[in-house]
């Protein structure tokens, strides 16, 4: 088979056969194709798209390019929740103890942050939680506490890593079929009864519009249907930072406040999204007959002590110390802190969640290339959230870092603030 013929065929809008797609994925996996040839193929897909059969074949071949993980969930309903990436998105960390308190089993593989999107693994490691476990060790965690969050295995869908790196440098990141196959190949490599995807759209997401997110969801549903897997997708707005924090240890601190019901320290939007996600999981998995019953069950669970106890057990089993979570000053103790004040009175908004994320990265909370080191204590607290009324001189943002915070940091943060009188 010849890669030039495949590129030409897709370039002219013709559908590829399963044999051709399998050959392409196998050739990428064994490194027998040049990067420029793979890139040309990706660009042809970007222009011409893929039909549902091609998409299924591509995803299946990507799954088969690596290992699949099979865990024993001990007859409990198993759920995998995935977010397509957002700013201030700490939902997975808060969700796991609630779901296990509701008697679900949650085996989750997560990634690190890159660019303006934060990573769950970085957030957990910032508070001493270990995430590097073998499948056997992960099963042991599941046996003891019905859950784990570990780093993405190098052996799962290795072809996706190659394709993603090339998409990132060839302006083909926003190809919906390629996004769908990338996300689903990793989700399908693990056995779970249900896959829930929190699909973000807006200024802080790669889907800039709700229409684009809906189209991507249809690709994902098509793949799941052909694999005979249960998939539920929730579309959620990422035009604002989620919650009151951007960072690593700082976002875990907001999760702690949430689980301990210290509501003044938690963003109202984060509280609302958590309720929506859990109630939709309860309804979709038939644990609740309707929304009213699901909401009641969610609140009864959250208001009890079980989620907090499950969380402490989770972090302890994964190598951190539960004692440090009882003293929040030990959990989050940045060396430097600087307020950013309102210049006038009025109604607050922010230019973009991405702008805030870039300030956070400049403080040390993120990475622009994979080799960048992260400052676990760096980040931003949104003391005032969008649409709140502020007075001149009010603290709007607080900046944190382990290194001195410069006037340039404060100026950059001030540029993200809009106050309308």
From Swiss-Prot:
It is an enzyme of class 2 (transferase). Pfam families: Glycos_trans_3N (PF02885), Glycos_transf_3 (PF00591), PYNP_C (PF07831). It catalyses: thymidine + phosphate = 2-deoxy-alpha-D-ribose 1-phosphate + thymine. Belongs to the thymidine/pyrimidine-nucleoside phosphorylase family. NCBIfam families: PRK05820.1 (NF004490), Y_phosphoryl (TIGR02644). This is Thymidine phosphorylase. Homodimer. InterPro entries: Glycosyl_Trfase_fam3 (IPR000312), Glycosyl_Trfase_fam3_N_dom (IPR017459), Glycosyl_Trfase_fam3_N_dom_sf (IPR036320), Nuc_phospho_transferase (IPR035902), PYNP-like_C_sf (IPR036566), PYNP_C (IPR013102), Pyrmidine_PPas_bac/euk (IPR018090), Pyrmidine_PPase_CS (IPR017872). GO terms for cellular component: cytosol. Keywords: Glycosyltransferase, Transferase. GO terms for biological process: pyrimidine nucleobase metabolic process; pyrimidine nucleoside metabolic process.
